[in-house]
Design a protein with these regions (language model features):
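Flavin (primarily FAD) cofactor-binding/catalytic cores of flavoenzymes
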Residues: 1-111, 178-185
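C-terminal, flexible cofactor-proximal segment of oxidoreductases
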Residues: 71, 82-185
Length: 185
C-alpha cells in the first residue's frame, strides 16, 4: 500500500474519473479523447445509485417520481409530505450536514406539534427554474449516470443544494420554520 501512495506522490500513478471509450494495446482511450498509456488498469465501475436505497415512495397510492421534485433546504422534497432525507456535503464532512438536518427535523417536528399540524409539504413557487442537477458538483461517473433520476434544485433559496456549511448554519439552524415554501395542515 505504501508503494502505491509513494508512486502517486512522485507522479508515477494517475487517477482519472472519466468514461472509458475503449482499451488498446497502448492503454485506455477515454471518451474525452485522452489516451492514457498504462501497464495496469483498475476500473471502478458498476455502482448504480438508487434514490432512498431503492425504496419506492407512494403518496395517495401514486408513486412519486423524485426526478420531477425540487429539493427544499437540501433535505425535503416537493410531492412528498412529512419526509426529510439526509444528504451530506461533498466538500466537507458528511456528518456536518447530517447534524444540521437532524436539528432542523427536530425543530420542524416541535413546530408542527406546538401548532397541531399533521402534515408539512414543500411547494415550489411558480416559475422556479432548475439551475443544475442536485448532484452536478460530483465528478464520479456513477454519480453522473444517476443524474436523470435524482431530485432537482432551483435557482434561489431555499431550493438550492448548498455545499457551504457556514451558509447552511444560518439558513437551517436559525432560519424560520414557517416560510412561504412550506404548507402546513
Amino acid at each position: 500500500m505504501v508503494i502505491f501512495f509513494e508512486s502517486i506522490k512522485i507522479n508515477k500513478v494517475s487517477i482519472e474519473t472519466e468514461i472509458i471509450d475503449s482499451f488498446s494495446e497502448k492503454g485506455v482511450q477515454l471518451a474525452s479523447g485522452k489516451l492514457i498509456e498504462a501497464d495496469i488498469i483498475v476500473t471502478a465501475t458498476g455502482i448504480k445509485l438508487q434514490n432512498f436505497g431503492g425504496i419506492r415512495i407512494f403518496v395517495d397510492d401514486h408513486e412519486v417520481d423524485v426526478s420531477k421534485s425540487f429539493i427544499y433546504k437540501s433535505m425535503m422534497y416537493t410531492q412528498i409530505p412529512n419526509f426529510i432525507n439526509t444528504f451530506g456535503y461533498i466538500n466537507a464532512s458528511w456528518t456536518l450536514k447530517a447534524d444540521l438536518t437532524s436539528k432542523y427535523a427536530c425543530r420542524l417536528i416541535n413546530f408542527m406539534k406546538d401548532n397541531n399540524y399533521a402534515k408539512c409539504l414543500p411547494e415550489a413557487p411558480e416559475g422556479l427554474e432548475e439551475t443544475k442537477g442536485f448532484l452536478d458538483d460530483f465528478s464520479s461517473g456513477y454519480v453522473r449516470r444517476a443524474a436523470s433520476i435524482t431530485v432537482r434544485q432551483g435557482n434561489k433559496k431555499p431550493w438550492v443544494n448548498n455545499q457551504n456549511y457556514l451558509k447552511d448554519i444560518f439558513e437551517i439552524n436559525y432560519g424560520k420554520i414557517e416560510d412561504n415554501s412550506l404548507r402546513f395542515s
